[in-house]
């Protein structure tokens, strides 16, 4: 094997050397083209397979942009070819988007229903072709309905009868659909989605009418009985209208409350009721107005109105005058035949007279305005009633304290004056856009509120505070009295103790004097007196104290003062 490869290489080298430059260039070009072909083939085969959304190219740019925009809303990536063919990633996505486009009337009018459903036409016998068409329609419509997000499963039966000889004997095409919604689906109560399934069937089967389509759910409830939905739609419309009226009433209520509560306070403005009548029926109004013609405009520099306005302007005027004089002659019929001239004119025949006739014709031009409008809704009569409480003032005595009688504070009610009520009524009328032509009604009343429970709570709180203040005052007075008694007792005790100590000191001093006198007398008499150790120490201590008092009188005075303060 190796020798053969070696010989092959030698032969190729030898042959390559023998070739001319042109032959070498041709070989290199062929090899390059082959490599490029392989690369293009691999790239093309690696691309994902796209499924056409509609087999018919869409040339209308506006319709194509609407379809692309709807696909983008569903997060579906689509490509558009140069001829206008829209493609998506897979068949399942294509079926789901076809259903959405059919439901929302985004399929172009010139698109063949067969192109939408991608049903092939079979060119065999008529019987086989009809069977294949029916089977293809059933399968395709079933797949499209299953592709919907709200549908778990579906069964479709379409009956296409044989062609009859006479149109009166021709039976209609019928279709029955059984859908099995998903557990969280609301398709059974959404009319728009059911209508989308009906459009799907009508596009799939030419000649199929709405009255011949029956769509039921797993409970055998007919879903496309739109006549039965009329009552529900009417109730839903009434509910929306009532919500609209309630929202408008809430806006007016907030406006009126904000206006009055800023003046009288939140607690004095209550019982606000607003009723707005609104005609929500759709009406077409046509109005023709004949307006005067302004010949000269008003000069803004003058303080008065110098404009000139006329009802009309003469555009064409014609005057004709006829004068006739002579014998009147009424022609009869042929000779021997009585004429058909009335008797009144016969009496005027063959008379001589003078007749003048003047005819004036004028064509007046007027200004005309025509207005055609659809009026809905129309705000009707507005009724507002609000109650404003007067002012309650607490009575005080000459000392500025509240007057309390039988456990309650006496109060005085001051009503709102009639002039102030008129001003408040005018303010409310301006706030709601009062119109006497609509027979609007605004009532601002001054009815005294029942504040019994409120006053009871307020009086109870006031009396409780007063009682607490009295208790605190008496407690403080009691504490002050106790402290005063204690201080008096302390002063008296100190005074008694001081006097007792003075008596003891005086007694000791007298005893000391008597003892010293006895010693002195004994010394004078020459007697030998012996002293005890305690007496000797007391004498030494007294001498030391006396000596210190003589040497340091200030220190001794400070020491005595400290003893007195401690006592």
Swiss-Prot record:
GO terms for cellular component: bacterial-type flagellum basal body, MS ring; plasma membrane. GO terms for biological process: bacterial-type flagellum-dependent cell motility. Residues 320-339 are annotated as: Disordered. The chain crosses the membrane at residues 26-46, 469-489. It is a multi-pass membrane protein. It is found in: Cell inner membrane; Bacterial flagellum basal body. InterPro entries: AMP-bd_C_sf (IPR045851), Flag_M-ring_C (IPR013556), FlgMring_FliF (IPR000067), FliF_N_dom (IPR006182), YscJ/FliF (IPR043427). Pfam families: YscJ_FliF, YscJ_FliF_C. Keywords: Bacterial flagellum, Cell inner membrane, Cell membrane, Membrane, Transmembrane, Transmembrane helix. One of its GO terms (molecular function) is cytoskeletal motor activity. The keyword Metal-binding does not apply. The keyword Flavoprotein does not apply. PANTHER family: FLAGELLAR M-RING PROTEIN. The basal body constitutes a major portion of the flagellar organelle and consists of five rings (E,L,P,S, and M) mounted on a central rod. The M ring is integral to the inner membrane of the cell and may be connected to the flagellar rod via the S ring. The S (supramembrane ring) lies just distal to the M ring. The L and P rings lie in the outer membrane and the periplasmic space, respectively. Belongs to the FliF family. The M ring may be actively involved in energy transduction. NCBIfam families: fliF (TIGR00206). This is Flagellar M-ring protein. The lineage of its organism: Bacteria, Pseudomonadati, Spirochaetota, Spirochaetia, Spirochaetales. The gene is fliF.
């Amino acid at each position: 094997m190796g020798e053969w490869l070696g010989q092959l290489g030698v032969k190729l080298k030898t042959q390559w050397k023998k070739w001319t430059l042109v032959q070498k260039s041709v070989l290199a070009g062929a090899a390059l083209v082959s490599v490029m072909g392989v690369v293009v083939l691999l790239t093309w085969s690696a691309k994902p397979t796209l499924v056409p959304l509609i087999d018919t190219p869409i040339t209308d740019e506006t319709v194509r942009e609407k379809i692309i925009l709807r696909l983008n809303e569903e997060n579906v990536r689509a490509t558009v070819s140069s001829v206008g063919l829209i493609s998506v990633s897979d068949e399942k996505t294509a079926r789901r988007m076809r259903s959405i486009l059919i439901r929302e009337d985004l399929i172009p009018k010139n698109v063949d229903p067969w192109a939408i459903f991608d049903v092939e036409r079979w060119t065999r016998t008529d019987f086989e072709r009809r069977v294949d068409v029916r089977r293809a329609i059933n399968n395709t419509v079933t797949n499209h309905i299953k592709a919907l997000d709200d549908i778990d499963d579906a069964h479709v039966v379409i009956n296409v009868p044989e062609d009859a000889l006479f149109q009166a004997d021709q039976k209609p095409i019928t279709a029955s659909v059984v859908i099995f919604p998903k557990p969280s689906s609301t398709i059974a109560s959404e009319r728009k989605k059911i209508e989308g399934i009906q459009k799907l069937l009508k596009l799939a089967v030419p000649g199929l009418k709405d009255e011949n389509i029956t769509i039921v759910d797993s409970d055998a409830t007919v879903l496309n009985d739109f006549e039965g939905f009329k009552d529900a739609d009417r109730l839903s419309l009434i509910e929306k209208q009532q919500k609209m009226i309630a929202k408008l009433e809430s806006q007016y209520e907030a406006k009126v409350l904000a206006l009055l509560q800023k003046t009288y306070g939140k607690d004095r403005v209550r019982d606000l009721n607003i009723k707005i009548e609104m005609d929500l029926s759709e009406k077409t109004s046509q109005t023709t107005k004949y307006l005067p013609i302004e010949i000269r405009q008003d000069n803004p520099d003058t303080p008065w109105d110098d404009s000139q306005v006329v009802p009309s302007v003469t555009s064409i005027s014609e005057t004709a005058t006829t004068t006739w004089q002579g014998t009147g002659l009424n022609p009869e019929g042929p000779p021997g035949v009585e004429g058909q001239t009335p008797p009144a004119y016969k009496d005027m025949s063959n008379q001589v007279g003078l007749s003048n006739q003047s005819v004036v014709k004028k064509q007046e031009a007027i200004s005309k305005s025509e207005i055609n409008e659809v009026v809905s809704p129309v705000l009707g009569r507005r009724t507002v009633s609000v109650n404003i409480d007067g002012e309650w003032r607490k009575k005080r005595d000459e000392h500025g304290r509240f007057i309390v009688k039988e456990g309650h504070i006496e109060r005085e009610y001051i009503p709102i004056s009639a002039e102030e009520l008129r001003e408040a009524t005018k303010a409310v009328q301006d706030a709601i856009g009062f119109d006497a032509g609509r027979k609007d009604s605004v009532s601002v009343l001054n009815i005294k509120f029942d504040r019994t429970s409120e006053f009871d709570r307020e009086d109870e709180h006031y009396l409780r505070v007063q009682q607490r203040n009295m208790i605190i005052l008496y407690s403080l007075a009691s504490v002050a009295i106790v402290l005063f008694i204690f201080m008096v007792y302390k002063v008296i005790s100190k005074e008694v103790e001081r006097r007792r100590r003075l008596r003891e000191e005086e007694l000791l001093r007298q005893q000391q004097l008597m003892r010293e006198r006895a010693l002195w007398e004994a010394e004078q008499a020459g007697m030998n007196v012996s002293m005890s150790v305690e007496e000797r120490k007391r004498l030494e201590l007294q001498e030391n104290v006396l000596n210190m008092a003589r040497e340091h009188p200030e220190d001794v005075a400070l020491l005595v003062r400290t003893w007195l303060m401690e006592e």
